[in-house]
Amino acid sequence: MSNLNLFETNQNKSISIMTQDITKLLDPLTEKFDGFSIKTLNVKHVDEIHELLNKHYIEDNDHIIRIIYSRDFLYWYLKYVPNNFTIGLMYKNKLVGLITALFVDMIMYDNKIKIPYINFFCIQNKIRKFGLSNILIEELKSRLLKIGVAYSLFTRMNCQNSLDKHFTSTIDFAIPINCPKLKSVGFIPDDEKLMNWKIENNPLSLMVKTDILSVTSKLNVHLQHLSVRPYLTEDSVHHFILPKKNIVYTFVKRDSRGYVTDMVSVYKHYAYILETGKIISNAQLSFYYNETMDLTQLILLLLDKLINYGFDQLIFRNFYDNGKINITRFETNGELNYYAGNISMPITCPNNMFMIPI
């Protein structure tokens, strides 16, 4: 890890990045809880991770749905997490807690930095009251400090009682695709007009490997007006954007010479309805750029394509340029706060930032 030259910053007056953690690491907490231990995990443990997350991962504030992921999605995600940064909390050889750190290239107010994005933080429901989450947090902090990293990015559902200072927050919106199914589970009113997203001669097609160079360059240009944004490489585009069945779907439009002029990408995850046990398929809007049409036109073409891949609704957050999407949508219960640990930075408007929505 230390040989990868991960952490180059060029600090300016807008933000301050701490290179040393000012808090004292707690004593090994597992010693205080009999039977618990820490275990380093990897993709070989995907079945255990899948079971834990699908039963105990985050729910919306009203406890209506739980976000769940397919086994294939988790395997794909974990492959990009560096060794030693998929950390499990075990109780008598059973996985009861998880935390991961995915290192992402970000530009934050003109500072280019590779930063750990903390994700899939999960503790089994029945043991949350014992404060076991601190075990995972302290273990991750310790491993990061060993490679000289005292900062991180993370998110959490909006909590009215939280005293933590976030630098921005976003709200999720949904555009119905499979209206009959969404009506049957109560996600949209019975009297809501059915939407027909079918478009004849849709110019979008799935992205292919030969598009990676062009897409990488154009996305970085399209994102450059944002103060907080990813910096994409051909490697990260290959992993996070190139289509992979049941994980990521990316569509492009080409001109008469075959050059990509427009692109749009979504991730696939699911909403598990706690009361009924029914499952809704979500397309989570991610990266895009548009040169030959406005954003609403691009999303309309996307909705037509998503019908053929079994998606029930398109979900998007009100960051990036997403406020320009002029299509009937429904506000969800998904409100997310964004934090920069050990980074002092300005409050940031959602339309001035973008993070990979995974």
From Swiss-Prot:
GO terms for molecular function: glycylpeptide N-tetradecanoyltransferase activity. Keywords: Acyltransferase, Transferase. It catalyses: N-terminal glycyl-[protein] + tetradecanoyl-CoA = N-tetradecanoylglycyl-[protein] + CoA + H(+). Signal peptide: none annotated. The keyword ATP-binding does not apply. Its EC number is 2.3.1.97. Pfam families: NMT, NMT_C. InterPro entries: Acyl_CoA_acyltransferase, NMT, NMT_C, NMT_N. Adds a myristoyl group to the N-terminal glycine residue of certain proteins. Belongs to the NMT family. This is Putative glycylpeptide N-tetradecanoyltransferase. It comes from Acanthamoeba polyphaga mimivirus.
